[in-house]
Swiss-Prot record:
A divalent metal cation 2 binds at D303. One of its GO terms (biological process) is cAMP-mediated signaling. The keyword Hydrolase applies. It catalyses: 3',5'-cyclic AMP + H2O = AMP + H(+). Its EC number is 3.1.4.53. Its cofactor is a divalent metal cation. This is 3',5'-cyclic-nucleotide phosphodiesterase 2. The active site is at H265. The gene is PDE2. Binds 2 divalent metal cations per subunit. Site 1 may preferentially bind zinc ions, while site 2 has a preference for magnesium and/or manganese ions. It comes from Saccharomyces cerevisiae (strain ATCC 204508 / S288c). SUPFAM superfamilies: HD-domain/PDEase-like.
Length: 526
């Protein structure tokens, strides 16, 4: 969905260009000021699933008069990139008619964002010029018969490279949180969990405290609340305090840095891994509250900005992000850089503590690279697992692949979602056989790309209902084979060894065994 925001623009002030281009947007919202805009963005982002107003499946434009609000277009765009990194949103000064040509790009931009394969392709491979704001004003193309700055259009759609470069730029700026954001009471966007707490005060703490935790059953508001509840407790235990509103701003910014439209690698997965990390820490790091806090924070940030694909796809097509990290642990380095920048801005005290401890958070995130799995398996079997750097790596690795250790009813739902994401990777590879990954998204070859079904209805069913594993297999009969492969290749030996070293974790290997037995009964012939 795409939105045109008209900020402080009265009907009489609308130019003919605005009126003529309103139909490119799914909705037009008139707001009094930029404060109201910030509230609208946050409220939309935490709407219930399926959230059509996530600002990722369409392009949104903010029209306003900078002179009225003492905030330039550039400053507002920087604010968007800083606090809403995954959003396809940009600002335009509506008082300058030549700027309004930008509206004519929206139809083509929306076609890229609404097709999940062209959207992911753009995220991963789109090339940018080197101008500070990502816009080459000398590059023009034709859209709807008019000459428009195509690079300016393309720069409005999220890419991994833009996310990374904007994050680095923010690190250099070291700007304070602007008033527009600072004055927001973030608790006001969490009405659903607050209402539930009023009825049952310990509700979220109870679900966080069990291995049967199911992040799939929670709304975005509830996921943020779970993160808030757990981190607040851990920070108090570690005596590394942060004000409630600052912690909520960090969590809202982090959620907006993940892609809601991803099936598996999203904020839901981040909360799931953080909860699993904490539960493992209660067994393995009982007397170290600072390390527990650091490791749980690494867990919630370990996949930030994840495109829902893999390192191999980035390497094979020689993406600029892959080249940036010399084809080594590409996504893990990408997540690490983004998350450390977020912490440097929102919780610098914690980042400082992390760096004093052999760059604790950085090492933990890099340990999640599955290409290194066998190395950590060897460490588990042949080294002292209580060695600090080995232990933190083992904990976050176990948490990252903990889906196969959850109860079967939960594990099967995660299996379904990762299968959908793998299917997207296969579709992306097929797409590359007909299109160069980095080619101009506004070229003619993009016009007739088939749009694959978004699977929203089936995903909603998985999230809302406790779906029986048998029903999942009926619709996706090859899931058992995929789960058996993953368990045999990565999980079984790892969790068996972990359980042998730490007897309190035997329930993990027991659950893997139970789940594998179920999948084996439903295995399809090769």
């Amino acid at each position: 969905m795409s939105t045109l925001f008209l900020i402080g623009i009265h009907e009489i002030e609308k130019s003919q260009t605005i009126v003529q281009n309103e139909h490119y947007f799914d909705r037009v919202i008139e707001l009094q000021d930029l404060d109201s805009l910030m509230v609208a963005l946050y409220k939309d982002r935490v709407s219930p699933f399926p959230n059509v107003h996530n600002f990722e499946t369409g392009v949104s434009i903010v029209l306003y008069d900078p002179s009225k609000f003492q905030l330039s277009v550039r400053q507002l765009d920087v604010l968007f990139k800083r606090f809403f990194p995954s959003f396809n949103i940009s600002a335009i000064d509506h008082t300058r008619e030549e700027n309004l040509q930008r509206l004519e790009c929206v139809e083509r931009e929306n076609s890229i964002c609404r097709n999940r394969i062209t959207r992911i392709n753009h995220w991963m491979y789109h090339h940018h010029d080197d101008t500070p704001d990502g816009i080459n004003k000398n590059s023009y193309g034709t859209v709807n018969g008019n000459s428009v700055p195509t690079q300016a259009c393309e720069a409005n759609i999220y890419t991994l490279l833009l996310h990374l470069n904007d994050s680095k730029a923010q690190h250099l700026r070291k700007a304070s949180v602007p008033r527009l954001i600072r004055n927001i009471e973030f608790m006001s966007f969490l009405s659903d969990p607050i209402e539930k707490i009023s009825q049952e005060g310990s509700h979220y703490w109870n679900i966080l405290s069990t291995w049967d935790f199911c992040a799939l059953s929670l709304s975005t508001q509830e996921l943020i609340w779970c993160g808030f509840t757990l981190i607040k407790k851990l920070s108090k235990d570690a005596k590394v305090l942060i004000a409630d509103n600052k912690l909520l701003l960090l969590l809202f910014t982090l959620e907006s840095s993940y892609h809601q439209v991803n099936k598996f690698h999203n904020f839901r997965h981040a909360i799931d891994v953080m909860q699993a990390t904490w539960r493992l820490c209660t067994y393995l790091l009982k007397d170290n509250p600072v390390q527990t806090l650091l490791l749980c924070m690494a867990a919630i940030g370990h996949d930030v900005g994840h495109p829902g694909t893999n390192n191999q796809l980035l390497c094979n097509c020689e993406s600029e992000v892959a080249q940036n990290f010399k084809n080594v642990s590409i996504l893990e380095n990408f997540h690490r850089e983004l998350f450390q920048q977020l912490l440097s801005e929102h919780w610098p005290q914690l980042l400082s503590i992390s760096k004093k401890k052999f760059d604790f958070i950085s090492e933990a995130i890099l340990a999640t690279d599955m290409a290194l799995h066998s190395q950590y398996e060897d460490r588990l079997m042949h080294e002292n697992p209580m060695k600090q750097i080995t232990l933190i790596s083992l904990i976050i690795k176990a948490a990252d692949i903990s889906n196969v250790t959850r109860t079967l009813s939960i594990s099967a739902r995660w299996a379904y979602l990762i299968t959908l994401e793998f299917n997207d990777c296969a579709l992306l590879e097929t797409f590359h056989k007909a299109h160069r990954p980095e080619q101009d998204c506004f070229g003619d070859s993009y016009k007739n790309v088939d749009s694959p079904k978004e699977d929203l209805e089936s995903i909603q069913n998985i999230l809302v209902n406790v779906t029986d594993p048998d029903d999942i297999i009926k619709d996706h009969p090859h899931i058992p084979n995929g789960q058996i492969f993953f368990i045999n290749t990565f999980a079984e030996v790892f969790f068996n060894a972990l359980s042998q070293k730490f007897s309190g974790l035997k329930f993990l290997s027991d659950n893997v065994k139970i789940n594998k037995e179920y999948w084996m009964k439903h295995k399809k012939p090769q």
